[in-house]
A protein has these predicted regions:
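N-acyltransferase acceptor-side catalytic subdomain
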Residues: 1-404
Length: 404
C-alpha cells in the first residue's frame, strides 16, 4: 500500500495521544457551533460527520470511570497502526469481552449453541463504543485512498489478534455501510439490524413537523405533550457549564432508578458523567424535567455535526407520556431549532414510528474463527437480512405522515 505500518495493541486509550486519536476519529473540521442556537439557513449535514462517541474524550471517560475495565468484562485492547516515525495512521476501539452484555447486537444464541457443542465462545473481540448503539466509524483512519489502505490493514489485524488470543470471534457493531462492505470483502459475515430515526425535512418549527402528519397522529401528539407536562412540570435544556455536579447527581439518581428496574444493573458509574461533562460538555444536551422545584426526570443526549443522539433516560416519578416528551418530542424540537438533520433515539422501539421516527437499517460485521460455527451463522444471517429488509418496508407503511 506504499506505507509501512506497525500494528500494535494498546491496553488503554491513553497510550494514544488525544490529538492523534481525534485526528483519525473525526478528521473533518466538525461543526462546533451546533450548540450556539444561532439561526441557520440550511440543515447541518456534512460529509465529515463529527461523532462524539469515538472521540478520545468519550472513550477515555469510560476507562477512567471504570465503566469499562476487565472487571466489567470490557478489557480495552485497542489496535494502533503507526509508521516508522511513530505517527499514528489508524486506530480501532476494541475490547476483549467475557460476556455479551451492553452491546445491543445480540449474539447470545450463537454463544449458547457454541458452548453446547463444546466450544468456548468467550473471550471474543468487540469493536464498538461500549453501551452505545449509535452508528459511527470503527476503523479509524484518514479519508481517501491512503485511509482505505489503512482500514484494510486494520481489518486483517483484527483477525490476526483474534487468532493470537485464541478468541472465538470479532464483532464490529454499528459501523457505517462502507466499512460493513469493506469487512465483508475481508471475510467477515455481514449482518443488518433496525433502528428508528427522525429526519428533519427542513422544518422551521415543531408545528411545521406536526403539519406533515396525518390529522389523527397530530392530535395524539399534541395531547400527549399536554398530558406530559400536566401538574406544573417544566422542561429545561442544560449544556456546557450548566452541567453542574448537582445536576449530574440528580440525573444519576434517575439513571440508576430506571436502569435497575428495567435492566438489573446499569453499566455507567457516577464518575463517567462528571468526566464527560467536564471534557465535552459542549457536546451534551441534558433535557431535564422539574416539578415543585425539584428535578424528577431527564434524558441525556450527545450532539454530532448533524445528528442528535439520544442515549440515556431515567425518572424518579411516573407521569404519563413524560418519557415520550423528554426523549422524542423535545429531541425533535431541539433538532429543529438547531437545524440538525437527524435524531437517533437509541436501540429498538417500534412505538417510535407513531412519533415520526422511521425504520432505518444499521450494520454489523462478524469474523467467526470456527469454520462450522461460521457456516451455521452465515446461513442464519442470510435469512435474517431478508427478514430485516422486509420488516423495514412493512413498518414504513405505519409512518404517521400525510399521504398526498
Amino acid at each position: 500500500m506504499g506505507l509501512e505500518l506497525t500494528l500494535r495493541i494498546a491496553h488503554s486509550i491513553h497510550e494514544a495521544g488525544a490529538d492523534a486519536w481525534d485526528a483519525l476519529a473525526n478528521p473533518g473540521p466538525g461543526d462546533r457551533s451546533a450548540m450556539s442556537g444561532q439561526p441557520e439557513t440550511g440543515l447541518r449535514c456534512t460529509d465529515a460527520e463529527y461523532n462524539p462517541f469515538v472521540s478520545h474524550a468519550f472513550l477515555s471517560a469510560l476507562e477512567r470511570s471504570n465503566s469499562v475495565c476487565a472487571r466489567a468484562g470490557w478489557q480495552p485492547l485497542h489496535i494502533l497502526a503507526t509508521d516508522s516515525q511513530g505517527a499514528l495512521h489508524g486506530v480501532v476501539p476494541c475490547y476483549v469481552k467475557s460476556h455479551s452484555q451492553g452491546e445491543y447486537v445480540f449474539d447470545h444464541g450463537w454463544a449458547d449453541a457454541y458452548e453446547r457443542a463444546g466450544g468456548n465462545y468467550y473471550p471474543k473481540l468487540q469493536v464498538s463504543v461500549p453501551f452505545t448503539p449509535a452508528t459511527g466509524p470503527r476503523l479509524l483512519a484518514q479519508p481517501g485512498p491512503k485511509g482505505d489502505a489503512v482500514r484494510d490493514a486494520l481489518a486483517d489485524a483484527l483477525i490476526d489478534v483474534c487468532k493470537r488470543l485464541d478468541a472465538s470471534s470479532v464483532h464490529v457493531t454499528f459501523l457505517p455501510e462502507h466499512e460493513w462492505a469493506l469487512l465483508g470483502a475481508h471475510g467477515y459475515l455481514k449482518r443488518t439490524h433496525q433502528q428508528f430515526h427522525w429526519s428533519n425535512a427542513r422544518y422551521v418549527t415543531f408545528d411545521c413537523f406536526l403539519a406533515a402528519l396525518s390529522s389523527r397522529k397530530r392530535k395524539i401528539i399534541r395531547r400527549e405533550r399536554e398530558d406530559a407536562l400536566h401538574g406544573g412540570i417544566t422542561v429545561h435544556w442544560l449544556t456546557g457549564t450548566e452541567l453542574t455536579e448537582s445536576v449530574w447527581d440528580a440525573f444519576f439518581k434517575f439513571y440508576m432508578h430506571t436502569g435497575s428496574r428495567k435492566w438489573g444493573r446499569p453499566y455507567l458509574t457516577r464518575a463517567f458523567f462528571s468526566l464527560v461533562g467536564e471534557s465535552m460538555g459542549d457536546r451534551i444536551v441534558l433535557i431535564m424535567a422539574k416539578r415543585a422545584g425539584g428535578w424528577i426526570a431527564g434524558a441525556l443526549n450527545f450532539v454530532g455535526s448533524s445528528t442528535l443522539f439520544g442515549r440515556h433516560w431515567g425518572a424518579i416519578e411516573h407521569h404519563p407520556f413524560l418519557h415520550f416528551e423528554l426523549c422524542y418530542y423535545q429531541a425533535i424540537q431541539y433538532a429543529i431549532e438547531r437545524r440538525l438533520a437527524r435524531v437517533e433515539a437509541g436501540a429498538q422501539g417500534e412505538h417510535k414510528i407513531a412519533r415520526g421516527y422511521l425504520p432505518t437499517i444499521t450494520y454489523s460485521a462478524h469474523y467467526i474463527a470456527d469454520p462450522a460455527l461460521r457456516r451455521a451463522i452465515a446461513e442464519f444471517l442470510k435469512r435474517e437480512r431478508s427478514y430485516v429488509a422486509a420488516a423495514e418496508q412493512e413498518l414504513a407503511f405505519a409512518a404517521p405522515f400525510r399521504r398526498e
